[in-house]
């Protein structure tokens, strides 16, 4: 329902998907008709372009469910308008999109809408004294970081992040990338950790500080290569991380998503990241048009 409840409802009516989309599109049309600004000086605010881009996304979603040609055409038209008339442009390479130097959404020309997590934004980035919400900031740098700081040669560092390792890629996701032709793979995933002061233990007597400590690959490593690395550094390949059917063997060590890392944190245990969260990028509009 779109009306507030004023008493106990004993027989609630489930709103249909169609009705929900009707309300969503009405809200977005209201935004576009309300003369929203086309630019923003205050980080993360909704602009006219953000409303149009979000509607293009949702039109495409709805069109794919209904196979509705008219909705597809509306999605195309809105996305094309954002591309042709908006102040956005594609980055020259994928790496620059998530480079920490370009993490300010207001200065990244590919970003249409974002959440402002800058250190000066005390609304989203404040330290909170709350049992449920301990602190603000962008926490994506935590949840994708694998458990590396208990491995030979490694200690927790700002460079490699604070490992909460809540999420990991499936084997299927890794196999979707052809790293020989797709520049996104190397930028999106971390595969190398260099020894940074941790104890090497008895199993790695030849490990060198500043050189490879852990190398992870989505491929199968030949035995001859494993034998050469023995005592020097740790190798983890697809057979170490995934079962034959693709299910997970280890949730602690994996090839983690690295594009959300935040090397600007003040300490190794700081959880408040200042990387802005990019919600909609103009790259998505090109995909919708395609």
Predicted segments, located by residue:
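An aromatic- and glycine-enriched ligand-binding surface/loop that stacks and positions planar moieties
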Residues: 21, 29-30, 52, 60-230
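Aromatic-anchored glycine-rich loop motif in surface-exposed flexible loops
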Residues: 1-47, 57-70, 74, 226-227, ...
């Amino acid at each position: 329902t779109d009306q507030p409840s004023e008493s106990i409802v004993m027989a609630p009516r489930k709103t249909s998907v169609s009705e929900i989309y009707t309300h969503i599109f009405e809200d977005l049309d209201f935004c576009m008709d309300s003369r929203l600004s086309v630019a923003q000086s205050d980080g993360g605010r909704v602009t006219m372009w953000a409303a149009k881009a979000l509607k293009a996304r949702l039109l495409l979603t709805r069109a794919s469910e209904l196979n509705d040609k008219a909705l597809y055409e509306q999605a195309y038209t809105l996305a094309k308008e954002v591309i042709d008339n908006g102040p956005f442009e594609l980055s020259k390479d994928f790496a620059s999109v998530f480079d920490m130097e370009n993490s300010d959404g207001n200065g990244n020309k590919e970003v249409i809408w974002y959440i402002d997590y800058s250190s000066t934004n005390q609304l989203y980035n404040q330290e909170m004294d709350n049992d449920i919400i301990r602190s603000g900031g962008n926490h994506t740098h935590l949840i994708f970081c694998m458990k590396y700081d208990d491995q030979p040669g490694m200690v927790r560092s700002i460079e490699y992040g604070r490992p909460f390792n809540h999420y990991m890629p499936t084997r299927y996701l890794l196999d979707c990338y052809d790293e020989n032709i797709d520049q996104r793979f190397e930028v999106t995933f971390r595969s190398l950790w260099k020894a940074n002061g941790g104890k090497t233990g008895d199993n790695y007597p030849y490990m060198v500080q500043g050189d490879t400590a852990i190398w992870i690959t989505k491929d199968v490593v030949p035995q001859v290569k494993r034998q050469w690395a023995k005592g020097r550094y740790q190798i983890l390949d697809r057979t170490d991380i995934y079962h034959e059917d693709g299910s997970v063997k280890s949730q602690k060590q994996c090839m983690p998503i690295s594009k959300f890392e935040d090397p600007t944190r003040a300490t190794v245990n700081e959880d408040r990241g200042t990387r802005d969260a990019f919600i909609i990028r103009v790259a998505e509009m090109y995909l919708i048009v395609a």
